[in-house]
């Protein structure tokens, strides 16, 4: 049996449950955080049949089994299953294909399934199984309260409503979870005198201010530098942080509740499996009063004592132009909300937003994933967006942007020639090359080209013919990704 989880920090909890339930079975773990020797032992154990249960992350989808009989993909909607570098396969889709070829069942589990999976379930391609009750029978859904950020005072980090709710929760000796998917202290430093901003010299992005190390860090290329003593633009002494991240929330909470035991969990301060496991164990054992974190704390964890969840900075996803942004925003809010009241405690979720009238919050208040998903599918169908079309993304990275765009224009010309020889253009549409949203990363300029097909078969047929022509001519400067999740 293969059990997949999207992130390494979800492994210990699932491993413990599997070992307790299948006490007589040998269970092994496979993920990128393990030493090479231990990964090899786990791989060989399932390959030789000495272990019959494998718990792992994306890489485990490729493990060799003597007689695989069942695949379970937990949190199947999670973006972590689709790699952004190297071999850009989806561990979820690979698992489905592997199960089909072996004639075995595959279970895709999620409280917020991807719209692709939900569409297949609605059409009958997948069998839909719904849990009729919660693991704790007396558990009630958390009450949703929206905090209109348009009423916040200038420079205010947390609203009065959030402060009052946190204070009341601490008085009850229950735990608070504060979610913000932004690391660092603030996403940018700015000079109010001349407008200078902490731009990365190697990327078309800003460097994030990390106050604990007094450094500016680019989260795209990793470039790091010390915070300048004065503005590099005009020499002014006052350089101010703009926006909030996990470190700023942690500092503000420390000022407001200095006696509260607080813990920040993100990739900056927990970089190893051992330290992360210890941190989550402290939360489970009640040694933490206020937990602050990013996606690392948003899903899968069974926090028994959390009765208040605070969600910050969700608006960036609500107004994004990414076709999947609202789907991911709703999934994030549902998943984070699900950390509250898991042991039957009366719970509440506070969301800070400038768009309290957005219909997405009505669905969230009723925990109505089905209603939200069905509405989104209607919109996607109307707009001709996935899962009603199938996409591929061709990207080019060059020293200069014109070179990257020119390489893609040549690929377009080649594609149009192939299309002209196919009935109805092969059922494929080729769009114009455009610069990527973040154009430059690590001194490489990036451009992309979107290809859409009416069916998966038509898209793949075209891509096979296309790659045979453009592949040898690209010199390795092109990357093709089928079913892209990031644009």
Regions from the PLM with identified roles:
Residues 1-405, 409, 417, 424, ...:
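Inter-lobe coupling/hinge segments of SF2-like helicase ATPases
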Residues 421-429, 469-484:
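Conserved short beta-strand edge segments in small beta-sheet-based binding/regulatory domains
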Residues 442-445:
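Basic/aromatic recognition patch in beta-strand/loop cores that engages polyanionic ligands
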Residues 452:
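Short, flexible active-site recognition loops that position polar ligands and cofactors
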Residues 407-413, 461-469:
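Short amphipathic alpha-helices in soluble, non-transmembrane regions
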Residues 429-440:
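Short edge beta-strands and adjacent turn/loop segments
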